[in-house]
A protein has these predicted regions:
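Non-catalytic alpha-helical scaffolds and adjoining flexible linkers that form interface surfaces
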Residues: 1-20, 25-132
Length: 132
């Protein structure tokens, strides 16, 4: 199984010396987990921040086994708010909600659109009223 899609990084965990297991929410495939080889390298670890929009190439031999991601950054959204603790906490909580509530490998474009709108709202001045 091989596909490409736009996604948001919703979580990441160290897997081995130089790899990570990432969980992403894609536009057409829903929540998917995969291994990113070299995910801890200086070259790509800086843009593997939770909440960033990425382009994902997913490969797996079997739908029941974990696959492998090759990724490219589309929009570095989280670094825009590194100096604003409230917005970073908001991003973290929103991505954790998606991680906990979304079903694995089930497409849900409404959630993807809501994540897009969430980052649009976060850029506005009255973001906290719209978020709540």
């Amino acid at each position: 199984m091989n596909w490409d899609d736009n996604a948001y990084l919703i979580s990441k965990n160290r897997y081995s010396e130089n790899s990570i297991i990432a969980e992403v929410f894609t536009e057409n495939h829903g929540k998917i987990s995969g291994i990113i080889f070299g995910g801890t390298s200086k070259k790509i670890k800086n843009y593997l921040q939770v909440g960033n929009k990425i382009y994902v190439n997913y490969n797996t031999k079997s739908p029941t086994r974990i696959g492998y991601f090759k990724i490219e950054i589309l929009k570095a959204l989280t670094p825009l708010y590194f100096d604003e603790n409230q917005k970073l906490s908001c991003i973290s909580s929103a991505m954790n909600l998606v991680k906990l509530l979304a079903a694995e490998a089930q497409s849900n474009k409404e959630i993807f659109i809501l994540i897009d709108k969430f980052f649009e709202v976060l850029a506005s001045n009255n973001w906290i009223q719209e978020y709540i």
